[in-house]
């Protein structure tokens, strides 16, 4: 059973750089947690991203309804909802068999709702690594005594 899950923000990087990072980390499934899966960058709009991932042999799953941000009452409150728990269970089920990367638009995970998703997955026994770029990852200090905050 694989117990590792990555996260990555699309940010302002291009699709080629995004896919290079995905491939460098041997990611098999991209789980899109954008509640509104659109972008100023055409290649990151849901339909185009889905097609591009499939072309590259990467599975694409959208879980924005369950795990997307921008929630009334705040995202922390949303983490207690049945929909959130359902989304987390779906991610966990996929991650038991494949290398998964949770994606959103925000580059920096500490400014994104991916940090709450990662925190929950951590309590379920998963190691969560937030990818910043090709050379840097981030794990909150209080979530890992074995890994530096930046690598």
Located regions from the model:
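Residues lining hydrophobic/aromatic ligand-binding pockets adjacent to catalytic sites
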Residues: 1-151
